[in-house]
Swiss-Prot record:
Keyword rRNA-binding tagged: no
Domain F-box: start-end pairs: 24-70
Species name: Arabidopsis thaliana
Domain of life according to the entry: Eukaryota
Protein name per UniProt: Putative F-box/kelch-repeat protein At4g35120
Length: 389
């Protein structure tokens, strides 16, 4: 009987994509304009990995054209910039969020960082971060430096009219407001505050709210709606830019807990939020009352007993919480504090729900993990600003 010759099965070769594969080469052969349009649609969190694919990718992802393209097609996204004061120097990071995991990525500055300034004030405006005033070697400064978050280059901006230390700042309707931080003799004059017009690049004086107005070192500044609020030990004031005047004694509601860099937003309405010793509460401007944020038990369970909330930041309508905890070490049969801390971040999505008792604010923990495993106990969070890039 004839037997058919059976051919042995052929080995299937696996194709491994490398920088030299036809697919990669075909992408590289496309015009930069087309590649740029594709890359602009991808989340910025992946740019660090994509820049390792090829030199052309690195060049495109490092250019200003990629951010211009993202802005043109409406693909911008919020990006928090965190500045940590580590021993003898400042370090800038961006907060990346990939597949529910948060991480701090070092920023490669394209230009030298300005001299270390103690007690300066920092504020985000558009795609830029302004660092204003402070002291250099014990001397007060009027200097203003701007970090372009597209190019990561520092540049000088026009100096303030008055040198300021420990001032507070905020961004409202195309202007940067800087309050306080000047000498007492200047607080009583037209120099208690200044306004920087981004279009004209000029500083203008902001008049004093009242004759007896005095700014203390712990004064606070907040933006709610279309008004600027200044809170001092004695009085609270609101400034209406549209009317160009101060509204005195607006403190019928306790504004002290709602001021600072922390604020959240629901349906584009800014409603400040504050941290209590163990829980977080939300201030409802419509009800003029504080409400406990529900649904955050997962967050509370993760925090240790030695935590300290550093900052709460509006993160594109979500709430970014940054805090530090002592690293505990085992000493015999007990836990003691080490000389180092770890930094945590959490992203909370907030929404308003109706209940039998009325509207409630609920939070859902989207991400929560350690972003810096170890820092010296002397570290400080110099600033956290969220820009749109």
């Amino acid at each position: 009987m004839d037997t058919a010759k059976v051919e042995p099965p052929q080995e299937t070769k696996k194709t491994i994509l490398t920088a030299q594969t036809p697919l990669s080469m075909s992408i590289s052969s496309l015009p930069d304009e087309i590649v740029l349009s594709f890359l602009a649609l991808i989340s910025k969190s992946y740019y660090r990995s994509l820049s390792l694919v090829s030199k052309s990718f690195y060049s495109l992802l490092s250019s200003t054209e990629i951010y211009a393209a993202r802005s043109h097609i409406g693909a911008t996204e919020p990006c928090p910039y965190v500045c940590l004061w580590l021993p003898k120097k400042h370090r800038w990071f961006t907060l990346a969020e990939i597949e529910g995991k948060l991480s701090l990525e070092p920023v490669r500055l394209s230009s030298s960082y300005p001299r270390t300034r103690v007690n300066s004030t920092t504020v985000a405006a558009g795609t830029e971060i302004y660092k204003i005033g402070g002291t250099v070697k014990g001397k007060r400064s009027r200097a203003v430096f701007v970090l372009d978050c597209w190019t990561h280059r520092w540049r000088r901006a026009p100096n303030m009219r008055v040198s300021r230390v420990g001032a507070k700042s905020c961004f409202l309707d195309g202007n940067i407001y800087v309050i306080g931080g000047c000498r007492k003799s200047e607080e009583e004059s037209m120099n208690c505050g200044e306004v920087f017009d981004l279009k004209t690049q000029t500083w203008n004086p902001l008049p004093s709210p009242s004759v007896n107005y005095a700014v203390h070192s712990n004064h606070k500044v907040a933006v709610s709606g279309e008004r600027l609020y200044v809170i001092t030990k004695r009085n609270n004031y609101a400034y209406d830019p549209n009317e160009g005047r101060w509204l005195p004694d607006v403190g019928s509601v306790d504004l002290q807990p709602i001021t600072g860099p922390w604020s959240g937003g629901i349906e584009k309405v800014m409603k400040p939020i504050t941290g209590r010793p163990w829980k977080y509460t939300w201030y409802s401007s419509s009800h003029r009352a504080w409400q406990r944020v529900m649904g955050l038990d997962v967050l509370y369970d993760k925090r240790g007993c030695g935590y300290r909330t550093i900052q709460l930041v509006n993160y594109g309508g979500k709430l970014l919480i940054i805090w530090s905890e002592w690293i505990m070490i085992l000493d015999g049969y007990s836990l003691i504090r080490s000389q180092e801390k770890e930094i945590w971040c959490a992203v909370i999505r907030l929404e308003e729900r109706m209940s039998y008792f009325g509207p409630q604010i609920w939070g859902e923990v989207e991400s929560c993990n350690v972003v810096v495993p170890s820092v010296p106990k002397s570290y400080q969070l110099s600033s956290c600003q969220c820009v749109s890039v």
